Amino acid sequence: MRITVVQCDTGKAIGTGRAILMFINGGGLTDINPDFLRTASLGAWLHLRGRNYTAVNRFFVFKADGSFAGTQATTTDINLSRNADEYTATATFEFSDPADQLISSGCATSTATRFE
């Protein structure tokens, strides 16, 4: 999956990244990301209608010194392609400190291609 972090109000790209997601039959979701300052994420997905899905996931975030920085929660709206091998998505995310107080939020877009 290719991720682009965007300004929520304008859609202007401000950063990019990659991840691998695994959608598990029955509604489970996990992802891995090459960023060493975070854990893999766990979450769930739900079929809405047609080729539209929603997913939520959460992971732990760490500071450069290895101390716990908080959590990030992401909600993603997914549009699956007709052949079910690709998708496009928009997402919102929230970063909370170790006391679960919201610190910041943002938006992202992503594209993904199935592999087996």
Indicate residue ranges for each PLM-predicted region.
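Sequence contexts marking disulfide-bonded cysteines in secreted/extracellular proteins
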Residues: 7-9, 46, 106-108
